[in-house]
Amino acid sequence: MATLSMTLSNPKSLSAPPRRLSPINTSAFTSTSFRLRTKSSFDSISFSSSTPFSASSLLLHTSYTKRNHRCFSVQSNAEVVTEPQSKITHKVYFDISVGNPVGKLAGRIVIGLYGDDVPQTVENFRALCTGEKGFGYKGSTFHRVIRDFMIQGGDFEKGNGTGGKSVYGRTFKDENFKLSHVGPGVLSMANAGPNTNGSQFFICTIKTSWLDGRHVVFGQVIEGMEVVKLIEEQETDRGDRPRKKVVIADCGQLPMSEA
């Protein structure tokens, strides 16, 4: 069984030696290598493996500088929502529960999707929300959370970032990069490199412009950003997995007249 070695070092304390994490099973992986590099307020993480991994694992090169972002609503002290970049054509929702083994309902996240700009990507996400193809997001978890960065979910097969599939097959190509990671609430596809989109996605909690041209943006949180922040604030283990299960207890599509 092949293993993946992960080294984590803290740029805030350069004198501290890197911390070694336990090996991660990569027997299901099907690509070659991936790297997540973070700069600024959070840790630098690098991954390497001679064993391929699935196209569902998130590849991000991150360097965070705080900038101002435009807002169109402030629904609570915890909720600041970035202005939509384009016309919203569909609305979907996640009802989120947090806790072990069965969580307490934490609230609803409503997401607007940009179907005119990225119709294939939007249709994939919409159908996974409704479950109309016989599989989808209901009952899956947010398996990876990095504060001041993003929350990641969508692996309804394995729940660890190595599974998931699109409604078109295992993966599909990057549709385009018309839209940008302009601020909190932006919804974007996780991938393992170019043209490896499946079902995994992430919701930004900051502006992440360094991801432009690498990940396909296709939606925006329009209600429930306080629930996104609640997920972001969950305690995580050294692999960025929330210690309490964060589950999409229910999900689906909303009429355009509803928010």
From Swiss-Prot:
Segments of skewed composition (Polar residues): 1-13
Domain (PPIase cyclophilin-type) ranges: 96-253
Xref: Pfam families: Pro_isomerase
Record's note on what induces expression: Down-regulated by pathogen. Up-regulated by light.
Chief subcellular location: plastid
UniProt name for this protein: Photosynthetic NDH subunit of lumenal location 5, chloroplastic
Catalytic activity: [protein]-peptidylproline (omega=180) = [protein]-peptidylproline (omega=0)
Gene Ontology biological process terms in this record: NAD(P)H dehydrogenase complex assembly; protein folding
InterPro entries: Cyclophilin-like_dom_sf (IPR029000), Cyclophilin-type_PPIase_CS (IPR020892), Cyclophilin-type_PPIase_dom (IPR002130)
